[in-house]
Regions:
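Glycine-rich active-site loop/strand segments that organize a redox cofactor
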Residues: 2-38, 149-207, 211-212, 218-222
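Short secondary-structure boundary/capping segments
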Residues: 6-7, 59, 73, 96-99, ...
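Sequence-level motif detector for i,i+2 pairs with an aromatic at +2
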Residues: 12, 64, 102-104, 212
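Residue-level detector of flexible, active-site-proximal loop/helix-junction positions
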Residues: 21, 58, 64, 111-114, ...
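Glycine-rich dinucleotide-binding loop and its adjacent helix/turn
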Residues: 22, 26, 32-35, 85-142, ...
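Feature captures the FAD/FMN-dependent oxidoreductase FAD-binding
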Residues: 28-89, 209, 214-216, 222
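Generic domain-boundary/flexible-linker signal
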Residues: 62, 92-93, 157
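A generic local structural motif
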Residues: 68-71, 93-95, 108-113, 183, ...
Length: 222
């Protein structure tokens, strides 16, 4: 459920799981989605994890000796629960999309795969965080005129003083900040993802670059 060219925003070396990490020869590269899936599958094999796919969790509650997890395949007892569903599993489609003329097709990042699936003509990309910026760049390079609706976004360099920005964040402890020590948790949870792209040339991807290659920037859609 991701576009074909998507790569992780984090370098390979930053893929760290308990007693398991990156084992390849390109630690500063960026994994594709098939490579990411293979990495997780290999980890499951190494630790003999009883992976259950297609399972719906209906509730989680604390009990005396840990947690009780109710699912559509039974009840589990465990000492710890990791919620890693991500923030983008359900597309956030603005209500104004329902008022668009029938002749205008709409796609969400969940359904978008590559520019070949799009109709001929110009494209409006709504949102300019990591996903929106990457998709806008890709569609523009396919030869279509692209307009990008921009809100509040965070611009960072891919490389700072010779180091990947994720290395800087990791070294500074930013990635380890506990949620209960954040000044404004509501704002933090709503801060858009960094404008980054994982690429072999480690290039920057921000509004300036998009403007330079010909992407038209406008304000918020709603």
């Amino acid at each position: 459920e991701r576009w074909d060219s998507l790569r992780l925003l984090t370098p390979n070396w930053l893929s760290r799981l308990p007693s398991y990490g990156y084992e390849g020869d390109d630690p500063h590269g960026f994994r594709t989605m098939p490579e990411t899936i293979a990495f997780l599958e290999r980890y499951a094999e190494v630790i003999s994890a009883p992976v259950l796919t297609g399972t719906t969790v209906t509730s989680v509650r604390r009990v005396l000796d840990g947690y009780e997890v109710l699912t559509d395949r039974g009840t589990w007892q465990c000492q710890a629960v990791v919620i890693a569903t991500g923030a983008c599993n359900i597309p956030n489609v603005p209500a104004v999309a329902e008022a668009l003329p029938r002749g205008i097709d709409t796609e969400t990042p969940k359904d978008y795969r590559n520019p070949d699936q799009l109709e001929e003509g110009g494209e409006l990309v709504v949102g300019a965080s990591a996903s929106g910026a990457q998709i806008a760049e890709e569609i523009h390079r396919s030869g279509r005129p692209v307009t990008l609706a921009v809100g509040e976004h965070i611009r960072v360099p891919r490389v700072y003083r010779g180091r990947d920005i994720k290395w800087c964040m990791d070294a500074a402890g930013v990635l380890d900040d506990p949620y209960d020590e954040v000044d404004n948790i509501v704002r933090v949870r709503n801060v858009p993802s960094l404008q980054l792209v994982g690429s072999d040339d480690r290039r920057n991807l921000d509004l300036n670059r998009l403007t330079d290659i010909g992407v038209r920037l406008v304000g918020r859609l709603v």
